[in-house]
Amino acid sequence: MKILASSTNYVLHNRLSNSQYEDARSKIVNFGGEFTNDAAKADYIFVNYSQINRVRRELRTIGTPLETCVSCKLIVKIDWLNEPKESLTPGNPYVIWHRKPEMKVGSPYTPSTRPASHTEAPNDFENHETPNTENNNEVKSIDNVDQEGSVYPTTKEYPYVLEIPRYACQRKTPLKCVNQAFVNALSVLKTCREVNGESVRTRAYGMAIATIKAFPLPIDSAEQLEKMPGCGPKIVHLWKEFASTGTLKEAEEFQKDPASKILLLFYNIFGVGASHAAEWYQKGWRTIEQVRKHKDSFTKQIKVGLEFYEDFCKTVTIEEATEIYETIVSRMPDGIKIQSCLVGGFRRGKPVGADVDMVLSPSHTHSTKHLVDVLLRILDEEFQFRLISVQEHSCGGKKGYVMLAVILSNSSKINRRVDIIVVPPAYIGSAVLGWSGGIFFLRDLKLYANSHLGLSYDSFEIINLKTGKDICPDEFNEWKDPVEAEKDIFRYFSLEYIEPKFRNTG
C-alpha cells in the first residue's frame, strides 16, 4: 500500500520514544513516502498531539514555526500510521490542521507586529509531557489562526535572535548573562522542584533558564519572552511578576520555609536523591547527625557522602582543581603517552566547583586498563585517597572507565571528589564533549543527534541507529589533542563549534 506515494513527510519527535519515532519513520517509507528531517520541506507533518496550538508551540521551539513550513498541506496525528484506512484529506479525523486554499503562503519567518487579540495557548508548563485538555473552548479560536507574527528582535551583532535556535547545542550560553537576576530567581524555583522530586517541572524550568541565558539582549517585554524555546505562559507570568517586583514570591517562600531547608540539606549530601531526602524528613530526621546514626543501611555512595559531608560542602577553586589535575598527569611514566583535559564546570569557566573531573586517553600502544592501573599507583603515591568505584563502559569493543575517588588535597588538606574518565583514542572527543556539560547543552545535543542525524550519542559511543554500529572507531580513530578531537564531533554533527565557556546552560 503506497498511500503516501510522492509525498515528503516529517515526524515531530516530541512526546515520542526513540522506538516510536523510528517505527513511524519505517511506516512512512513502507507506505511509499519520503522522509525528511526538515519540517519546512514536508508535505505532511506527523505529531503525537491532538491540539494544533501545542503543535505550533513545538514547531517554534525546534526553530521551524508553522509559518515557515510552506510545503505543509496537513498535520496528522501519528496514530493514523497504525491504521491508514482513509486517505489523508482535510476531512480525515486524524488531520488536526490543513492549509486553507485562501491562505497566502509567505516568505520565510520574518518579524512583524503580533496581533493584539492573540491569546497564548493554555499553560502546559506544569505538565510538560502530557497534552493539555483543559479550556478546550478557549483554544478553539487559536486553532483557526493561520499565521502568527514573530516578535524576535534581530540585530547585526546577534542575527540568530531572529529565530533563536531550538537546541541549546546551537546557542552560545555564557556563565553570566544580561538577564542574570531573573535567571537566579528561576533557578531557585528549579531547585524547589528538584528537591521535591518533580522531575518534569525541574526539566521545564531548566529548559527556560537555558534559553534565557543564551538570549543576548535584556528582556523588556512579555511578547519578546514568550517566543523563546521553552518559555511558555508560566515563565511569562513569572517574568511579569519579577519585572514589577524585582523578586518571585514563591522563590522567597521556598528559601524561608523550614521544611524546604531540611530537604535541601539532605538533598545536597553526595549520593542522595529527592526520594531519600523526603523519606528521611518523614521519619522525623532533621540533622546530618541524625542521618548518620542510620548509615549502616545506606548505599556505599551515601555512606561516603555522609563521611565527607563537611569537606564536600566546601567548594574547590579552579586553582586547586588544576593543581590536582597537573599532579596526576605530570607523574605519568615516560613510557606512557597520554592526551588529557580538565573538564566539568572548570572547563566552562566556573571559578569554583563541587568536584574535579578529568579525561585521559592513552596512545594506541597502551590499553585503557593499563592506564587505569597506572593511575591507581599515582594516586596511591601522591595522595591520601580512597577509591570509591571503577565503572566499566563499552567503547566499540574496547573499554572505557570512570574512576571515582576521594583524595586529600595536598594544598587545602580538604577531601575532594575526583572523577577520572579513561577512554581509547577514538573516544576522547566524545568523552571531553560529554564531560564538559552543561546539562541542557548535552541533553539537546543528544536530541539533535537523534532526530536530525539518526545517531545516539553519549560520552562513550556514538551509535548509528540504522546500523546499530558505533561510528567512533571509523570516524575518529586518530589520537589527537582533546580540543581538536572535540571539534571533530561538532564537524561530524554539522554544528558550529561552541566554546566550552558558552555551554553554561545549567
From Swiss-Prot:
Please provide the Gene Ontology terms (biological process) for this protein.
base-excision repair; double-strand break repair via nonhomologous end joining; error-prone translesion synthesis; gap filling involved in double-strand break repair via nonhomologous end joining
The EC number(s) attached to this protein equal 2.7.7.7
The entry's protein name is DNA polymerase type-X family protein pol4
Membrane-crossing segments per the record: none
Q: Which GO terms describe its molecular function?
A: 5'-deoxyribose-5-phosphate lyase activity; DNA-directed DNA polymerase activity; DNA-directed RNA polymerase activity; metal ion binding; single-strand break-containing DNA binding
User: To which species is this protein native?
Assistant: Schizosaccharomyces pombe (strain 972 / ATCC 24843) (Fission yeast)
Which residues does the record give as Mg(2+) binding sites? 355, 357, 419
Against CDD domains, the record matches this protein to:
NT_POLXc (cd00141)
| Entries under SMART domains matching the protein | POLXc (SM00483)
Keyword NAD in the entry? The reply is no
